[in-house]
């Protein structure tokens, strides 16, 4: 597949349906929708576009398991839901992931693809597998067993992260030039990241100045989230081998650009406004959250010195 990138909206940082529509071509087969940072995307609008163009919606809820969207869990709204289980997610098994679907034909294809096109767990209805290219995407039994036990803890882990995020929100609420996480109506946020936007004009100094000051105070915060279209693989258009595949494939006659500027909202937020506190790599105590709030207030009390 050849990815075509749509821009994001700046409230929940998820894909912007308007940008998705602008980027659909005759070659488009699916829309991959990450539910980013812990908040579901604008899924009804995206599903409407998918229905109009007969596309599959693959909802990546790796950062948002158990988040709610209009009464449904993230990952169960699109045609397929996927979530990874590596070490910095809400729960983890070391490696591996999960696919969700209520479509039996899609489920069967995924079950075959995971193991070289073979039905190894249970008999499948597919009579002729000659058109099936399979891979080794098997999740080991040990990892699966760990995952089952981790799932039992998920509700309490997420509840604790929401409590800590609420405490952060309350503590940072009155600091000028900051926009704290937005939670849309009929949605819940499970805070894989506590995302913050800096308004440099209101604050009077740059995002990077306050970021560096916060890091100096020991705050576990980042100021970058990869803009994928600017990564070397897309800039050089070389993914497999050294000859430019898949972009040089004779099957693909379209044109795709990955120039800086095609996703202006994502680029501006990454370059000038975004900061984020990871909430899943470490289980914060209330005392540690208080320390983060104290560090923010200390930096803000000294903004004039930092300018």
Where are these regions (language model features)?
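Basic phosphate/pyrophosphate-binding loop/patch that engages nucleotide-derived ligands
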Residues: 24, 47-56, 93, 98-116, ...
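Active-site region of PLP-dependent enzymes
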Residues: 64-70, 74-193
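Conserved PLP-binding catalytic core of the aspartate aminotransferase-like
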Residues: 181-260
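PLP-dependent enzyme catalytic core of the Aspartate aminotransferase-like
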Residues: 203, 236-307
